[in-house]
Amino acid sequence: MSNAPYDPATEGARMNFKGRMSYGDYLMLDRLLDAQAPLSSAHDELLFIIQHQTSELWMKLAIHEIKAAMAAIAKDDVQPAFKMLARVSRIFEQLNGAWDVLRTMTPSEYTLFRDKLGESSGFQSFQYRSIEFLLGNRNLAMLRPHAHHPELTAELEAILAKPSLYDEALKLLARRGFFIGADGQRTDWRGTRSESPEVAAAWTSVYRDPQRHWELYELAEKLVDFEDYFRRWRFNHVTTVERIIGFKTGTGGTSGVNYLRKMLEIVLFPELWKLRTGL
């Protein structure tokens, strides 16, 4: 047995990348790893930055998958949407795990750099707002934090001009022969829709005969799966913030924990949750 160090080149691995695309080139790691610029000497500021930057990367993928799922549902090509929505659920499972890393930072450690954040706050996240709007939580007041970036406002307005993910699911429900009341005549998508007894009755019919309406049933369960993970993400956000800053005002001027708790009251797909009581 040779004691020489293992050399991957002996098995054909390329070791010289001059003039060729390497792993770092493909992922543009020089730019990615140069994007962390702490404003203080505090040890934990790098953790804070990376936590939020990686969350934004995962949200970028979530938006990609949600939009693709919506397009598939709109074309009655429902099966691929199942995979996409399952992936979004896994993304939020990953994001939930990230809170555990941030929670290793104590209140004392956070105070060492909090003043460097200025008025920046997570509720100003363009991608998070995009996800909320795509899912149907369309609070138009939340356009205002992006008004200083007209191009971002235009992208959010473009999302508001089209049906949400749940709207696309309801349109599919109607195309499959179910009566969905006023939701069937909607043409203005900008606001948050109201809960509907007709929609609840339609989904209840699906759940009472899942074999007959398997695609609709599976789609509904994928939506519930996703909202379940999304709720956990919101809850973990609340508890992490309370653990680190208590009930202080948020850096963006919100009421901090109290603001985040209000978000826990929002239900994205209300009929899919309420129908369970009557089955």
From Swiss-Prot:
InterPro entries hit by this protein: Trp/Indoleamine_2_3_dOase-like, Trp_2-3-dOase_bac, Trp_2_3_dOase
GO MF term set: heme binding; metal ion binding; tryptophan 2,3-dioxygenase activity
Residues the record lists as binding substrate: F48, I49, I50, Q51, H52, Y110, R114, T251
Substrates-to-products reaction catalysed: L-tryptophan + O2 = N-formyl-L-kynurenine
Keywords, sorted A to Z: Dioxygenase, Heme, Iron, Metal-binding, Oxidoreductase, Tryptophan catabolism
Domain of life: Bacteria
Gene Ontology biological process terms from the UniProt entry: L-tryptophan catabolic process to acetyl-CoA; L-tryptophan catabolic process to kynurenine
Name the UniProt record assigns to this protein: Tryptophan 2,3-dioxygenase
Organism in which the protein naturally occurs: Bradyrhizobium sp. (strain BTAi1 / ATCC BAA-1182)
